[in-house]
Amino acid sequence: MKHRTAPMVRHPLAAALCVATILPGVALAQTPRERALEARIAELERQVYLLVSAQQQQQSQIAQTQTQVSEVRSLQAQAPAAPVVPAGKKPIQLSSITPNALPGTTFRFGGFIKADFMTTRTSDGALPEGAVGRYLYIPTQTPVGGQASSTDTDFHAKFSRFNLGVDTVTENGDKLTGFIELDFFGNALASQVNNLYGGTLRHAYMSWNNWLAGQTWSNFIDATILPEAADIVGPTDGALFSRQTQIRYTRGAFSVSAENPEILTTPYQGGNTLLASDHGVMPDLTARYNWKGTWGTFGLSAIARQYRTRSALTNDTDFGGAIAGGGRWIINSSNDLRYQLSYGEGLGRYLGLGNGSDVELDVDGNIHTVTTVAGWVAWRHDYSARLRSTIMYSRVDYDHALANTGALASASQQSLRTNIFYSPLPKVDVGAELMYGRREAENGDSGDISRLQFTTKYSF
């Protein structure tokens, strides 16, 4: 009997190949459970990779932030210290908002919105349409001569103003200041259609430590003592009131300046006519000294001037000057007294808004200075923190030569006014003022002016 195992023995290579072919198929035949486990492992590996990447990115961002913080702290250490702010108050501005400004520069903006409502009566003639005297008290414009009386009503907002200021303290401690202020006193299309008012430059100056250059209040005057009034000046007749371009040096309470040498001239037989000229070579030179204490303030000032004329008849030169004193006396917490007195040869341009002439011309065109005495006094009383009133009297006298000026030149001007102001809110003022003024000419003719004025003002 024959066996069938021989062929398998004879072909071992074929058997091995058969087994090798079958086994991989068995190994690849995974169950669904095994495939699910492998998928979960792959997902876990992906999440671990994402976490590691996020951590590396976060560490990079932290490093960048630390670098930026270090740079900011370095810049802050180099910048000047911020001003100390009182407890409970936040600073309005921490850094400059002016382009290319020096470090430590601050910017300020201010002003007020003022509206005036007034009715004016003149006894001897009318104030012309558009005359400056229709909007504020100009003593030289008070009509005289016996013409019919006139009454006018005017509303305007000409004296609203705004200002810009820049202040800097350098690394060396030098103080730099720039200041500019405008109102709308110009008369461009004053009451036509839209009541457009032209801008008027009040202040435009810069200061460096003790030096000042530009246009501002004359060093000869002290504007801080002027009383509160609905009128933009108040005691206009006898008050020193002038802003002009100058160079000033201040050291403590003492100051000196060289200022614009404009003069006001009454031509021969010109009556009340005032002509402006600037033929002078020498600037107006002033000196001032101020005292202040718990009692109030007081100041003395002096001015030296040169007067020159040019005409077909002659060129003449003369010199003059003036002195002034004034201040504020604090009587008590509810009352104060303000005052000023001035005397000089050629003082007219510095009084009020150019109240009178500095010089007059004779028949040959020669200069003669006009002797002038002026002053005012004002008493203020506070009824409460919100309600107050002021009464004031002002006067100026001129010593003209009738042979030079003629009979219509002003011999004197005076006014009396009283007002009351109420502040319903901080920075808001409403007030009413009654004024009576009188101008007398050299020939004895006179004219009166009365004005009732209401005003509102919001300061910012």
Where are these regions (language model features)?
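Outer membrane beta-barrel
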Residues: 94-131, 139-265, 281-282, 286-292, ...
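Detector for outer-membrane/organellar transmembrane beta-barrel domains
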Residues: 292-410
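Outer-membrane beta-barrel "beta-signal"
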Residues: 422-424, 448-460
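Sequence/structural signature of outer-membrane beta-barrel proteins
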Residues: 120, 185-189, 218-233, 259-272, ...
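Gram-negative bacterial Sec-dependent N-terminal signal peptides
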Residues: 2-28
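C-terminal closing repeat unit and adjoining cap/tail of repeat-based domains
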Residues: 416-433
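N-terminal periplasmic/intermembrane-space "pro-region" immediately following the signal or transit peptide
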Residues: 28-128
